[in-house]
Amino acid sequence: MENSVEYVFPSESQAYRFLNTVKHFDAEELKVKYGRSDRFVAVRYRYALGEFDATLSRLDDLARELEGEEAA
């Protein structure tokens, strides 16, 4: 199952830092790119079936550390 989420940050530099950090996450079929603008980052990955997948929790925690949040 595929999951996608978009985050928004107060500045382009925070979004860029998030994007570059997430690129190195260990997640199946991970795709990370800028979203609607340079303050938005879109993340898409395949949810691991049959086991607990903490990817979304890790994304949320990292976004929070960089003053970002899930985009509405």
Role assignments for model-derived ranges:
Residues M1-A72:
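Acidic/polar low-complexity segments and flexible, solvent-exposed patches
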